[in-house]
Amino acid sequence: MKIYYIGILRIGGEKALELTSARDLSQFSFFERNGVSQFMTFFSETVSQRTQAGQRQSIEEGNYIGHTYTRSEGLACVIITDKEYPVRPAYTLINKILEEYLSLHPQKDWANISATNASFNYDNLEHYIKKYQDPSQADSIMKVQQELDETKIVLHKTIESVLQRGEKLDSLVDKSEALSSSSRMFYKQAKKTNSCCIIM
């Protein structure tokens, strides 16, 4: 599971404008990185421009999926992942990023600009692209599910060890039943012996 790109874009006019972005291109060779980076920007601008406000879309392109959400303010976030990255954590992260970005850069700051500049950068994107390579970090439900799965594994191990003990307990129970049978046998034998010698 891998996140390759996170971008925040201003929607409106003829073309979307990338305000800030972060990329993890470590899986690509040095010579591919520039072309891949340009393609990711182009893909993000195209997809976000064609996503209506309030709508979420996941678009598959080759081995990659672009998850996008456009807010009513005209701000969109695009995350490009591989096909294995779960959808819910991607959208959870998109919502988080857009909320934080809007609190730092209100709509009036970027609504009417024609070109981006360093003042629109959002340094947390670099942190997020590293941290959220593990999708359970973005999605608390997924994190709880992962913890439950781990607990389930521990419980299965505990149950297996109890069953092994249980097998030993069963053999003890069998032995105690055997004692009980021999005790019964002794009792019956003693009863027979006592019954044949009746004193008159």
From Swiss-Prot:
InterPro entries: Longin-like_dom_sf (IPR011012), Longin_dom (IPR010908), R-SNARE_YKT6 (IPR045848), Synaptobrevin-like (IPR001388), V_SNARE_CC (IPR042855). A lipid is attached at C196 (S-palmitoyl cysteine). SUPFAM superfamilies: SNARE fusion complex, SNARE-like. Residues 7-126 form the Longin domain. The keyword Secreted does not apply. One of its GO terms (molecular function) is SNAP receptor activity. A lipid is attached at C197 (S-farnesyl cysteine). Keywords: Cell membrane, Coiled coil, Lipoprotein, Membrane, Methylation, Palmitate, Prenylation. It comes from the Eukaryota. Residues 198-200 form a propeptide. One of its GO terms (cellular component) is SNARE complex. It is a lipid-anchor. Its main location: membrane. The modification Cysteine methyl ester is found at C197. Pfam families: Longin, Synaptobrevin. GO terms for biological process: autophagosome-lysosome fusion; endoplasmic reticulum to Golgi vesicle-mediated transport; intra-Golgi vesicle-mediated transport; intracellular protein transport; vacuole fusion, non-autophagic. Residues 140-200 form the v-SNARE coiled-coil homology domain. It is found in: Cell membrane. Belongs to the synaptobrevin family. This is Synaptobrevin homolog YKT6. It comes from Debaryomyces hansenii (strain ATCC 36239 / CBS 767 / BCRC 21394 / JCM 1990 / NBRC 0083 / IGC 2968).
